[in-house]
């Protein structure tokens, strides 16, 4: 007999050739709250408790199993969501109410030294669990209503190559964001352009050229 989470996960049917709106069918009990490269996340309420159901695309079922195992290793850390149930294609987890760092920048919610330090502690917990924190970006860091920072989307925490993404974000925070003249509210359009240029290594190449020019 299927658990409720399994049954609800099975109601989610994705369109195969759609990039932005992949949900073809789903239970009315599920509300779409997040979109990612390998899965969509839905909110559901059971017994008065709100939870998040992450349902992976069929081609990413192996990622579901991998991410569930990583969350199990992180179970002792307060910086990651509690996991209630896992399956071949889904993870049922704690619903974290708050704003992503991405939305903080869009809305002008201040990012503080304490928030940066909490991310550092979260990644330190992951390393202590034998993991290699990777693919840390503004959308998987959440500031809760109590001021706590939580980290989600940990599927790449077992990759072996070095990922400098968090170090680059931290450097930008100290070198740019903390400057009094730097805007604390940035339109999403510009955030997307910055992310695109970063992925294309534009900033890395540009600053490397400047360094060579003035060295």
Swiss-Prot record:
Q: Name the EC number(s).
A: 2.7.11.1
Q: Which UniProt keywords apply?
A: ATP-binding, Kinase, Nucleotide-binding, Serine/threonine-protein kinase, Transferase
Q: Where is the active site?
A: 135
SUPFAM superfamilies on file = Protein kinase-like (PK-like) (SSF56112)
Kind of enzyme, top EC level? transferase
Gene Ontology molecular function: any one:
protein serine/threonine kinase activity
Pinpoint the Protein kinase domain residues. 27-215
Protein transport is among the record's keywords: no
Question: What is the protein name stated in its UniProt record?
Answer: Putative serine/threonine-protein kinase YrzF
Query: What is the source species?
Result: Bacillus subtilis (strain 168)
Higher taxonomy: Bacteria, Bacillati, Bacillota, Bacilli, Bacillales
Name of the gene: yrzF
């Amino acid at each position: 007999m299927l658990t409720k989470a399994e049954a609800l996960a099975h109601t989610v049917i994705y369109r195969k050739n759609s990039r932005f709106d992949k949900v073809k069918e789903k239970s009315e009990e599920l509300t779409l709250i997040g979109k990612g490269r390998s899965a969509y996340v839905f909110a559901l309420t059971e017994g008065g408790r709100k939870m998040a159901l992450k349902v992976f695309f069929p081609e990413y079922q192996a990622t579901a199993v991998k991410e569930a195992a990583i969350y199990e290793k992180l179970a002792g850390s307060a910086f990651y969501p509690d996991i209630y149930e896992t399956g071949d294609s889904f993870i049922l987890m704690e619903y974290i109410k708050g704003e992503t760092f991405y939305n903080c920048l869009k809305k002008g919610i201040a990012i503080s030294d304490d928030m940066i330090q909490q991310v550092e502690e979260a990644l330190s917990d992951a390393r202590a669990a034998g993991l290699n924190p990777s693919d840390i970006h503004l959308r998987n860091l959440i500031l809760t209503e109590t001021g706590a920072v939580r980290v989600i989307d940990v599927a790449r925490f077992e990759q072996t190559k070095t990922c400098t993404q968090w170090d680059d974000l931290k450097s930008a925070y100290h070198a740019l964001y903390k400057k009094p003249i730097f805007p604390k509210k940035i339109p999403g359009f510009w955030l997307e352009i910055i992310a695109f240029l970063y992925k294309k290594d534009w900033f890395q190449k540009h600053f490397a050229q400047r360094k060579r020019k003035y060295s």
